[in-house]
Amino acid sequence: MPITNLTKKTWLATKVRKADKFVTRLVGLLKRTQLGPEEALWLMPSRAIHTIGMKFPIDVVFLTRDNRVTGLISGLVPYRISGFYLKSYSVVELPNGTIRKSQTEIGDQVEISLVEVSEMDDLKDTRLSHIG
């Protein structure tokens, strides 16, 4: 399930885990020691997150129901709580530095594509070929 910034024609992640149940949102990335460069956690519904108990900083992208960026936090360090983003419906937690690398800004349109796991290897070689 890749996440693409359609406005900037850049990728945020190619390996995304969806957390849409209470327990998966609560646990989040707590058991992880790091995120790979193309990994992300997509939490829904969510308007705020915390990094209490986490071991590494993350970038955070807040999205509306139609996946428009409504908030950004770069380098949120462990043991912090984000602000509450009233217009957000979901949150994407990404490796530190992803917001800068992807040039993502508030107002950008993001696409989260459902892709079969077997298709993930093909995506790495054809990045952005489907974006006009």
Short names for language-model regions:
Residues 1-132:
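Compact, glycine-rich, soluble single-domain proteins
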